[in-house]
Design a protein with these regions (language model features):
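Bacterial N-terminal signal peptides that target proteins for export
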Residues: 1-8
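Intrinsically disordered, low-complexity peptide-like regions
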Residues: 4, 20-24, 35, 131, ...
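A periodicity- and composition-biased signal for non-globular, repetitive helical segments
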Residues: 8-9, 90
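Bacterial N-terminal signal peptides
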Residues: 9-17
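Bacterial Sec-dependent N-terminal signal peptides
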Residues: 16-55, 63
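A well-ordered secondary-structure block
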Residues: 138, 142-234
Length: 235
């Protein structure tokens, strides 16, 4: 009788454990791609944040007080500035860990270009921090808003307003960008058949650009449109 009771208890415990694991997996599978990307950013921040001092993280957060920027837009400055503080350290942490925007197919040449990014960052010296600029922001915001509504995917600013980018350089991307880290890393990797010259990467790693405007707005076909206007001058 005791053996029967013991066996029943073992079976019950195993069943409870199995159900708990199954429930956990169901909960994970129910997350949307946006939630998975947000969780990923939180996880890698927990994993790598101690590689930068509190003072370095404070310095990187140049857009913290820019009330006209969204949280995601502020994060773009933060991660780009962590890179600019110490490119090799960024290469060994965030750049090496990145796997693309979850729920979206990585562009052509993603793996090779990620490796070339890591190798390039390992050779770079610190750069001036990027700072927010309202004129550059409004130039970026106008194009992101109008371009997103019209379904634009490139640098063609033709249409109502926003014909001229006031900055010296511009980056444009469309996709499931719900975190600043995904914006920064996708543009740095610069995957895609039309990005063989790595134009976005070259702009973001150009030490002459110290001022930037960033806007992330809804896109008609591809969830979000990101526009970044950069300049060497404070406009």
């Amino acid at each position: 009788m005791k053996k029967t009771v013991y066996l029943f208890a073992m079976i019950a415990a195993f069943a409870a454990s199995f159900l708990a694991c199954d429930s956990s997996n169901d909960s994970e599978s129910e997350l949307t791609p946006d939630q998975k990307n947000q969780n990923y950013q939180s996880e890698v921040d927990s994993k790598f944040s101690q590689r930068w001092t509190a003072e370095e993280r404070r310095l990187a957060n140049t857009a913290a007080s820019a009330s006209y920027l969204s949280q995601v837009e502020k994060e773009v400055y933060y991660y780009l500035n962590l890179l600019r503080i110490d490119p090799p350290r960024f290469a060994e942490t965030y750049a090496k860990d990145y796997r693309g925007v979850l729920g979206w197919i990585n562009g052509y040449g993603f793996d090779e270009r990620q490796q070339s990014l890591i190798q390039q960052l390992a050779t770079l010296s610190p750069m001036p921090l990027l700072r927010p600029n309202e004129m550059l922001f409004y130039s970026a915001e106008c194009f992101a808003s109008n371009g997103g509504k019209l379904g634009k995917v490139g640098h063609d600013r033709s249409g109502p307003g926003c014909e001229q980018n006031v900055g010296l350089a511009e980056c444009v991307a469309c996709g499931g960008y719900v975190t600043g880290l995904s914006v920064v890393m996708d543009l740095l990797v610069d995957a895609g058949e039309g990005n063989a010259l790595l134009g976005h990467r070259r702009i973001l790693l150009d030490e002459h650009y110290e001022w930037m405007g960033v806007a992330v707005r809804d896109h008609r076909d591809f969830q979000h449109m990101v526009v970044m206007s950069l300049d060497s001058r404070e406009l």
